[in-house]
Amino acid sequence: IPDNASLFISIGTTMEAVAAELVRQRKNLRIITNNIYAASITAARTDYTVIIASGVVRPLDGGITGVATVDFINQFKVDYAIMSTHGIENDGSLLDDDYKEVSVMQAMVNNARVRYLGVDHSKFNSNALVRLGDIGAFDKLFTDRTPSAAMQKTLNERGVAWQVADPVSK
């Protein structure tokens, strides 16, 4: 993500770690998020504009979801979407547990020019109930370990670049 970019940041602890790294490394970002913790982390920067989506806050993780959230996200067109999900199957299916969160994530995908997916290795072949979409909707996958040969094949077939990310600094 370059300086001066606009971006969506989705729900999840992975996205909170990404937000902390952005704060350390990037300037003048415009961030729209449905993650109250990512908003809190990034709002510490006076050169950032941080916009929090409207909707219902989930007590468990501070995620904001619902119809109002989807409508809010659909008002924007950003440079990047940085997202995570609960599971990726070898056929490229992206899965999550909350259908309300999935609708918000789909709106983010549809309103971003470049889409990044960040997941740790535990998300590969992890089951979840709701289908978010296909990995082919993303431009690049960032993860902490090399994906399996089957997953690499799917990524290559869909034209999705992938990278093992450097560990998050503390």
Question: How would you name each of these model-derived features?
Answer:
Residues 21-26, 42, 46:
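Active-site catalytic pocket residues across diverse enzymes, especially alpha/beta-hydrolases
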Residues 32, 36-170:
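Conserved phosphate- and dinucleotide-binding cores of soluble alpha/beta proteins
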Residues 1-24, 31-34:
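Helix-turn-helix/homeodomain-like alpha-helical modules used for DNA recognition
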